[in-house]
Regions:
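Signature of alpha-helical transmembrane segments in polytopic membrane proteins
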Residues: 1-148, 177
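Acidic, Ser/Thr-rich low-complexity segments on the non-lumenal side of membrane proteins
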Residues: 154-186
Length: 186
């Protein structure tokens, strides 16, 4: 079990999801929000602001995920808790992006602000959640079939320790424990 590699997979997936979400959102802005004033010039869709966003925003998302602890304890995660953390971080991050980056954009009506916020949140959250769910499911499967395990020591001896060992190892699905020994107590 290589924790650094597994953490890198999450970081890479989060980076890709942030890039994909920003790209799709940028296209949405250029084709559905701004054409009323600026028109649509396909050659100028991916301009300097887009490139700057592709550099800064994914790194910002990675920092936010790091600060909220989404890269800690990657093997012992509940997918539900991870989903809740992703929702909370996405709401905070999208709100930050909205107020500090998007609020000065041209909109034809104030209802467009609601659309912009909702579309950015939906794109970012859904793409990130799908990537994370896939990684977490693969990880849980590896834990359940015993490919990934956690070194475990049973404290006790004789029949009682053997009984505990047999109860844990006889389960159809592995709990992730890889027993490395017993500590004998008198």
């Amino acid at each position: 079990m290589n924790k650094a590699l597994q953490t890198f997979k999450y970081v890479f997936a989060d980076y890709l999801s942030a890039c994909l979400a920003w790209s799709l959102f940028y296209l949405y802005r250029k084709f559905y929000i701004e054409p009323d004033k600026f028109g649509v010039d396909p050659e100028k869709v991916f301009d300097r602001q887009y490139v700057l966003g592709m550099i800064v925003l994914p790194l910002g998302w990675l920092l936010a995920y790091y600060l909220t602890g989404l890269y800690k304890n990657i093997y012992r995660k509940s997918r539900i808790n991870e989903l809740m953390q992703t929702i909370a971080t996405s709401i905070i991050g999208v709100t930050f992006i909205f107020f500090f980056i998007l609020l000065d954009d041209f909109v034809s009506s104030y209802k467009a602000y609601y659309k912009v916020y909702t579309v950015l949140f939906a794109l970012h959250f859904l793409i990130t959640a799908v990537f994370r769910f896939i990684l977490s499911t693969i990880t849980n499967h590896k834990i359940n079939n015993g490919t990934i395990g956690f070194n475990t020591v049973i404290i006790g001896s004789n029949q009682r320790a053997l009984k505990i060992y047999e109860e844990i190892t006889s389960s159809h699905k592995s709990s992730g424990n890889k027993f490395i020994g017993f500590i004998h107590l008198d």
